Amino acid sequence: MKKLLAILLSLLMVAGLFAGCGSSEKAPETTAAPAAAETEAAQASYMDELIAAAQAEGTLVVYGSCEEEYLAVACEKFQELYGIEVQYQRLSTGEVQSKIEEENGNPSGDVWFGGTTDPYNVCAAAGLLEAYEAQNASHLLGDAYRDADGYWYGIYKGILGFMVNIDELDRLGLEVPQDWADLTDPKYEGLIWLSNYNTAGTAKLVINTMIQKYGHDEGIQYLVDLDKNVQVYTKSGSGPSKNVGTGECVIGIGFLHDGITQIVDNGYGNIQLVIPSSGTSYEIGATAIFKGCKHPNAAKLWIEFALSPDCVNLAQDNGSYQFLVIDNATQPEVATEFGLDPENVMDYDFEDAKNNITTYVEEVMTALGGGDDRFKTE
């Protein structure tokens, strides 16, 4: 009898152990939901407080380096959502950089919207941008689409390439260039347009791309050779694309989404897009807060807005067909229909570009003898 009681007692103890183990495994499930709920509640509370503070400031001033149509509707949407008056001005990235450098910590604008990150990095290094840890940055597709210290956040990705007027090339008896090296062929003399290295972030990306592709000295020499065929250097990066369809520009170097705009929205079926056969690079279009801005809470709210579908989904309905870089956005199908692939790009060294672009621009302009009248912006 005693032996039987001992066996029963042992079985009860083992059962108790299993029951204990089972309850310990389920414990995180009972606490995970409240923890997530608390986080969401804290984020919602933060946004409510930020919106109230931004509305108390009443105004936001935006400098936009994206296309003006997209800039306008984004600013209108922000004003509609939050009841904050938005003033905006469209400037190239180089113009924005020059403006806030001159204002030196007392900016007339609050935020920068659009344009490639190279000028943003120069301004961040000069202490002209304000770091901000955005709540909506959690939706970015990867760390490559933000500054590590929060000085800027990516909103889109654009592919660099050529746009050509096939009617004009056919009339001239010339084939479509397929790669970067083709553009230095003397037969294309006077047919190429490129943006200005001094004023356009697109042109700065071209410099970085050639140096990373060919090496420092060879990259600068490539740009010297290319210069012999360049007819016009435009102030803005989208300038070449806007003149290809009319035939004024026969070969334009720039972002291919700008070419799509000309084909789809403006009806220029004579434009062909060319992705360089040996590879190409890309921009990350960004947004940032100016250090010392007059409306800091409205500026922070803009960053949250810019990292949301409310903002970025407006792009493709307003002539901007870049790939989007947040996980809850709707990608522009038309970009892939034209053969663009956001992953089919070279391994672009953003750190080298960040640290050296100012020096590279100076070196290129020196190699070009300081630049002729084509580089005048007035």
Where are the regions a protein language model picked out?
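Conserved C-terminal helix/tail region of periplasmic/extracytoplasmic solute-binding proteins
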Residues: 340-378
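A short alpha-helix/helix-coil micro-patch that ends at or immediately precedes a cysteine
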Residues: 74-82
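Periplasmic-binding protein-like
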Residues: 158, 222-227, 233-234, 267-291
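A ligand-binding cleft/hinge motif common to bilobed small-molecule-binding domains
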Residues: 118-122, 251-270
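Short, low-complexity disordered leader/linker segments with a strong preference
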Residues: 1-57, 373-378
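Extracytoplasmic ligand-binding site segments that recognize negatively charged/polar headgroups
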Residues: 61-75, 87-103, 107-248
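Mature extracytoplasmic/periplasmic domains
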Residues: 280-348
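A generic structural signal for short hydrophobic patches within well-formed alpha-helices
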Residues: 120, 169, 259, 311-312
